[in-house]
Swiss-Prot record:
Gene name tied to this protein: glyA1
Protein name: Serine hydroxymethyltransferase 1
EC number: 2.1.2.1
Broad class of the protein's primary localization: cytoplasm
This protein's UniProt keywords: Amino-acid biosynthesis, Cytoplasm, One-carbon metabolism, Pyridoxal phosphate, Transferase
Cofactor(s) the record lists: pyridoxal 5'-phosphate
Residues involved in (6S)-5,6,7,8-tetrahydrofolate binding: L121, G125, H126, L127, S355, P356, F357
UniProt-listed NCBIfam families: PRK00011.1
Length: 417
């Protein structure tokens, strides 16, 4: 029998030590990985609730197990809030991750071997958009488009040319490292020209979309997926959205369960419901505007300091810095910044001469630092510190000086007050 007083402390101190160390790292380090953010304690409360005990295969009102009357209400709340937040007619809140939401879309709309056209991972796309190492590149005939390496922008005429040539059954719009605004009407027109489904993966910009600061793909796409973390600032999970279409809705539901998953994670669905409610608060738009302002301010510092920012700047929460001209690798830059307690991720850039394990770029994002309360002033200062380290790569004194300034800034802006 379990006790309500059970604690990890004193029972599994080795595990607790690692957990506490990670929480301390989050407080003491500046987080600039574009896909990371901090959730509210409300989201954490939902994830740590007794809902984790309940199996609930199926959908609200159509479960395969009994005792689901309360979790049905939880899931229905999440569904209704997701629909309201994004202006969708349909929402499936069960996918465990963005990749599983994407896999469900493939399963619902395609047959193995069908042709899909998505953005190349090397040019800012995502693994699930047709990369050879992903299920999307193994089970389907994946054709890739990229950016114009001169402008750093998607060349929609070229996307259309490739689409006409390969006749995809599904056209994918979305990215993991593209800093400009996607033209959803143009993607729709290209999809219509070749008779393809248009699938939009808005995982990185869902929070901006919810705040009305980035175009909403729902009016144009046959289906939209997103994660619920990143800019949306919720738990790690996935979400599928669409306009009203009874036939497609049934396909999406079946592709999630039983097609790709068993029982949903009800504690995570509850946390999604919390984050959707938080995203409807007036302050959420203010936060998202600050995310954009901070990213644009940081990108400008890099440009001023002589670094190449892919696409020439940013319209959203992230930007990609090419280190090719400086003769540096993303791997060594990532490590040097880590020693100064600044966390970024190495990232491939277009026409990267290095392997994906080394790379020639850094991806930088501002959702997490903005959650801490950083404004443009702090982000300009932070970008300058990063440039100092990159200009003096391996200089221990520079790293130590930056680390001390990082410590002071983190103390002034704790993650949780």
């Amino acid at each position: 029998m379990f006790s309500k007083q059970d604690q990890i402390q004193g029972y599994d101190d080795a595990l607790l030590s690692a957990m506490n160390a990670e929480e301390q790292r989050q407080e003491d380090h500046i987080e600039l990985i574009a896909s990371e953010n901090y959730t509210s304690k409300r989201v954490m409360q939902a994830q740590g609730s007794g809902l984790t005990n309940k199996y609930a295969e199926g959908y609200p009102g159509k479960r395969y197990y009994g005792g689901c009357e309360h979790v049905d209400k939880v899931e229905q709340l999440a569904i209704e809030r997701a629909r309201q937040l994004f202006g969708a007619d349909y929402a499936n809140v069960q996918p465990h991750s963005g990749s599983q939401a994407n896999a469900a879309v493939y399963l619902a709309l395609l047959q193995a071997g069908d042709t899909v056209l998505g953005m190349s991972l090397a040019h800012g796309g995502h693994l699930t958009h047709g990369a050879k190492v992903s299920f999307s590149g193994k089970l389907y005939n994946a054709v890739q488009y990229g950016i114009d390496t001169t402008t750093g922008l998607i060349d929609y005429d070229e996307v259309e040319r490739i689409a006409v040539e390969c006749q995809p059954k599904m056209l994918i719009a979305g990215f993991s490292a593209y800093s400009k605004t996607l033209d959803f009407p143009r993607f729709r027109a290209i999809a219509d020209k070749v008779g393809a489904y248009l699938f939009v993966d808005m995982a990185h910009v869902a929070g901006l979309v919810a705040a009305g600061l980035y175009p909403n793909p729902l009016p144009y796409a046959d289906v939209v997926t997103t994660t619920t973390h990143k800019t949306l600032r919720g738990p790690r999970g996935g979400l599928i959205l669409a306009k009203a279409n009874e036939e497609l809705e049934k396909k999406f539901n079946s592709a999630v369960f039983p097609g790709g998953q068993g029982g949903p994670l009800m504690h995570v669905i509850a946390a999604k419901a919390v984050c959707f409610k938080e995203a409807m608060e007036p302050g959420f738009k203010t936060y998202q505007q600050q995310v954009i302002d901070n990213a644009q301010a940081m990108a400008q510092v890099f440009i001023t300091r002589g670094f190449d920012v892919v696409s020439g700047g940013t319209d959203n929460h992230l930007f990609l810095v090419s280190l090719i001209r400086q003769g540096l690798t993303g791997k060594e830059a990532d490590a040097a910044l880590g020693r100064a307690h600044i966390t970024v991720n190495k990232n491939s850039v277009p026409n990267d001469p290095q392997s994906p394990f080394v790379t020639s770029g850094l991806r930088i994002g501002t959702p997490a630092v903005t959650t801490r309360g950083f404004k443009v002033t702090q982000c300009i200062e932070l970008a300058g510190w990063i440039c100092d380290i990159l200009d003096n790569l391996g200089a221990a004194d520079v790293e130590a000086n930056v680390a001390s300034q990082v410590a002071a800034l983190c103390a002034d802006f704790p993650v949780y007050r």
